[in-house]
UniProtKB/Swiss-Prot annotation:
Entry function: Binds together with bS18 to 16S ribosomal RNA.
Cross-referenced InterPro entries: Ribosomal_bS6, Ribosomal_bS6_sf, Ribosomal_S6_plastid/chlpt, Transl_elong_EF1B/ribsomal_bS6
Name of the gene this protein is made from: rpsF
Record-linked Gene3D superfamilies: 3.30.70.60
Family stated for the protein in its record: Belongs to the bacterial ribosomal protein bS6 family.
Keyword line: Ribonucleoprotein, Ribosomal protein, RNA-binding, rRNA-binding
Cystine pairs: none
UniProt lineage: Bacteria, Pseudomonadati, Pseudomonadota, Gammaproteobacteria, Alteromonadales
Protein name as annotated: Small ribosomal subunit protein bS6
Length: 137
């Protein structure tokens, strides 16, 4: 079996259907004995250039190990699904399991946001305690 990196863009109005599409497409790949090494749903993102007058799309990245026949079947499914705006399948030399730069950046943003949210809350609680002590005196 060979290793592939697959990226596909879904119409932004069909974002709710993406989990079902991912399940269907991973089913095609694993049915032939394939294995999913990495699956990342990047969500709605800005496009570099408009596609069919759309400026945003829902991005999905998969790194898989499967047969060439199942990849052909997947590409056919992409072609016949009108919600898939673009797709790209690249053959890779080895399995890639680490998080992509996009996912790493998102994780860093999420941790930074959560720490920023905690800091003002801690300051606010200290202020409330101080004001309670001042009024108690």
């Amino acid at each position: 079996m060979r290793h592939y990196e697959i990226v596909f863009l879904v119409h932004p109005d069909q974002s709710e259907q993406v989990p079902g599409m991912i399940e269907r497409y991973t089913g095609i790949l694993t049915q032939a004995g394939g294995q999913i090494h990495r699956l990342e749903d990047w969500g709605r993102r800005q496009l570099a250039y408009p596609i069919i007058e759309l400026h945003k799309a829902h991005y999905v990245l998969m790194n898989v190990e499967t047969t060439a026949e199942s990849v052909e079947e997947l590409e056919t499914a992409f072609r016949f699904n009108d919600a898939v705006l673009r797709s790209m399948v690249m053959r890779t030399k080895a399995a890639i399991t680490e998080a992509s730069p996009m996912a790493k950046a998102k994780d860093e943003r999420d941790t930074r946001r959560s720490s920023e949210e905690r800091a003002p809350r801690a300051e606010a609680t200290e202020e409330v305690k101080e004001s309670a002590e001042n009024t108690a005196e």
